[in-house]
Amino acid sequence: MADSNLNVPVIIQATRLDTSVLPRNIFSQSYLLYVIAQGTDVGNVANKANEAGQGAYDAQVRNDEQDVILADHEQRISAAEATLVNHEERIRQAESTLQDHETRIAQNESDISSLDTRVQSLESQVSDHETRIDALEYATTRKKSEVVYSGVSVTIPTAPTNLVSLLKTLTPSSGTLAPFFDTVNNKMVVFNENKTLFFKLSIVGTWPSGTANRSMQLTFSGSVPDTLVSSRNSATTTDNILLATFFSVDKDGFLATNGSTLTIQSNGASFTATTIKIIAEQ
């Protein structure tokens, strides 16, 4: 704390010292001048002392102010150090948490990599299953040609006649000859698969009266031709003829690669058909 006494000036009691206040004819002129100079020197010393005291007081006041500032700085530094310690502790905790996170992330990345491998394997299996399912769906999907011709009058002669050539000139009541009956090459074709083909031909019509021995014959061309024959009694007025069979189709086999020509002929007399239904199914 500043000493207030330093702020009190030195007071000189003898404020005037000159030749008028000294005894005359006692001291020499040199001594009188010396005494007068001493008074001046004392005044100068007092002034300097007052200036020094004032400076010392001002310095102590400034020191007191700086002490307050330093105390505030020390307090703030202490608070900052405490905050820094807290920050260091939190940083250590954060680093520990980060290390834990890095460990868990590394584990997760390893798990994800394993899962990616398993997902890729599953995707490959799914793709394989989809391919197999598509194949199974295709294999179990029925392909069929079913055509009905009704209200017609078609003569089936006694000479061998290509059945597809005969049918393609007619207008069907329902259905189409495709895909099993090729109207360009006039033959029956099959899908190149190891699947059985079922065939049925139903014809309604009549032979001329008086025809004794009569039958309908259908031949399928092939390495070993198959022939179907339906015989009818002469007493029957309206004849319902049914010719049905099946073919065990082999992939890349003769029937799959060549198809089969269907040749029909009426034995005994020409046959007039009024309704025809032909079905092929694989």
Curated annotation (Swiss-Prot):
Residues 2-60 are annotated as: Interaction with tail hub protein. Pfam families: Phage_tail_NK (PF16532). Residues 61-139 form a coiled coil. L-glutamate binds at E146, K200, S248, D250, L255, K277. InterPro entries: Phage_tail_NK (IPR032395), Phage_tail_NK_sf (IPR038681). Transmembrane segments: none annotated. It is found in: Virion. Residues 132-282 are annotated as: C-terminal globular knob. It comes from the Viruses. Trimerization heptad repeat repeats lie at residues 61-67, 70-76, 77-83, 84-90, 91-97, 98-104, 105-111, 112-118, 119-125, 126-132, 133-139. The keyword Repeat applies. Keywords: Coiled coil, Late protein, Pore-mediated penetration of viral genome into host cell, Repeat, Viral genome ejection through host cell envelope, Viral penetration into host cytoplasm, Viral short tail ejection system, Viral tail protein, Virion, Virus entry into host cell. Cell-perforating component and plug protein of the phage tail machine. Together with the internal ejection proteins is required for stabilization of the condensed DNA within the capsid by plugging the hole through which the DNA enters. Host cell membrane perforation allows viral DNA ejection. The needle penetrates the host outer membrane. The needle is released and the internal head protein gp7 is ejected to form an extra-cellular channel. the N-terminus forms the domain that binds to the tail hub protein and plugs the portal vertex channel, the middle coiled-coil rod, and a C-terminal globular knob. The tail needle knob is bound to L-Glu, which might play a role in the assembly of the phage tail needle knob in vivo. Homotrimer. The trimer forms an elongated coiled-coil (280A x 25A). he N-terminal tip may exist in a pre-ejection extended conformation, which may fold into a trimer of hairpins only after ejection into the host. Interacts with the tail hub. Interacts with the head-to-tail adapter protein. Belongs to the Lederbergvirus tail needle protein family. This is Tail needle protein. It comes from Shigella phage Sf6 (Shigella flexneri bacteriophage VI). The lineage of its organism: Viruses, Duplodnaviria, Heunggongvirae, Uroviricota, Caudoviricetes. The gene is 9.
